[in-house]
Amino acid sequence: MERSHLPETPFDLAHSGPRFQAQSSGNGSVLDNVLPDMAHLVNPYWSRFAPMDPMMSKILGLFTLAIMIISCCGNGVVVYIFGGTKSLRTPANLLVLNLAFSDFCMMASQSPVMIINFYYETWVLGPLWCDIYAGCGSLFGCVSIWSMCMIAFDRYNVIVKGINGTPMTIKTSIMKILFIWMMAVFWTVMPLIGWSAYVPEGNLTACSIDYMTRMWNPRSYLITYSLFVYYTPLFLICYSYWFIIAAVAAHEKAMREQAKKMNVKSLRSSEDCDKSAEGKLAKVALTTISLWFMAWTPYLVICYFGLFKIDGLTPLTTIWGATFAKTSAVYNPIVYGISHPKYRIVLKEKCPMCVFGNTDEPKPDAPASDTETTSEADSKA
């Protein structure tokens, strides 16, 4: 695939970063301090923009450092707890473990590289590391998104289908994880062998798939990639949680009607919605889908802006979109790990200071069959 070529510049690291005075002069282009070995990868579109304010680079660097620490600690603890506790190594929790592992690898592979480039205010690691960085972002991002999808579908299978559903076994869970990684590897390798390419983004401190070149090759990749790595898992997540909430709402309604027939106020010890299975599942569903949208949709919109030649795309918007997408690695351990009651119990045993609030599971006064069904739904939430 033909790429844009720019003339080599007399740029060197000694005059980059905070010491590069031309950055603050208000003159020149963002491409003025691109390294010669990266010049042929940069799209000429970005030449119209002035260099990013050095203060913004510092802010982005500190923000990236903060989310890296939070994410690596949070996901590291989830991997340690779920992987090191035999009672938690269930088929469903293997998917949670896979999600935490991919999120950990995402931040461990992306954040240090971004911080280095934020300091120098350009990509200083060469074309090879551009491919490695962008490839890791694509690989672990795809694994995380599809892990979330498989988790949602597992909840759908247990809560909606119930005894009519096929229980997931360790073997089934491992097969799903292998499928996720094989698909992610496929989409990661394609730009390396000619279907699209990995190139620097507008601010020159990060690399991603090429969404600026006006050719069918990169366009076809981005459209197909977004179909399989965004729209398909999004549809499956929404589909699963829609029927989960509907099923639990029907169960709650049946319990209330049964309570009326028995001439009691409730079959539960409390009608507090926050403590009911319906309330918990609704919160998890809303949180999951909302955070998923918040993290990834802005970056997809940025890619489509470039794909369809829409004005308004700037180096600053591209880097904030890329950085914000990575915050999904911070949300996931909270949604999928800390909300897990048994996880909180084990975490309190191994690290009491890491747990806030009560870790005791509620014990409603209900018939055994109702309690068992509700507890199963709660644990899946």
From Swiss-Prot:
Residue spans crossing the bilayer: 57-81, 94-119, 134-153, 173-196, 221-248, 284-307, 315-339
Gene, per the UniProt record: Rh2
Origin species: Drosophila melanogaster (Fruit fly)
Lineage, broadest ranks: Eukaryota, Metazoa, Ecdysozoa, Arthropoda, Hexapoda
Subcellular location: Membrane
Role description: Visual pigments are the light-absorbing molecules that mediate vision. They consist of an apoprotein, opsin, covalently linked to cis-retinal.
Segments of skewed composition (Polar residues): 370-381
InterPro entries: GPCR_opsins, GPCR_Rhodpsn, GPCR_Rhodpsn_7TM, Opsin, Opsin_RH1/RH2, Retinal_BS
Keyword list, A-Z: Chromophore, Disulfide bond, G-protein coupled receptor, Glycoprotein, Membrane, Phosphoprotein, Photoreceptor protein, Receptor, Retinal protein, Sensory transduction, Transducer, Transmembrane, Transmembrane helix, Vision
Extracellular side: 1-56, 120-133, 197-220, 308-314
Protein name: Opsin Rh2
Residues exposed to the Cytoplasmic side: 82-93, 154-172, 249-283, 340-381
Signal peptide: none
Topology of this chain in the membrane: Multi-pass membrane protein
GO annotation terms (biological process): G protein-coupled receptor signaling pathway; phototransduction; visual perception
Cysteines joined through disulfide linkages: C130-C207
Annotated positions of the N6-(retinylidene)lysine modification: K326
Post-translational modification: Phosphorylated on some or all of the serine and threonine residues present in the C-terminal region.
Region (Disordered): 359-381
Coiled-coil blocks: none
GO terms, molecular function: G protein-coupled photoreceptor activity; G protein-coupled receptor activity
Glycosylation, residue list: N27
Keyword set includes Transmembrane: yes
GO cellular component: membrane; plasma membrane
Expression by tissue: Predominant opsin expressed in the dorsal ocelli.
Family: Belongs to the G-protein coupled receptor 1 family. Opsin subfamily.
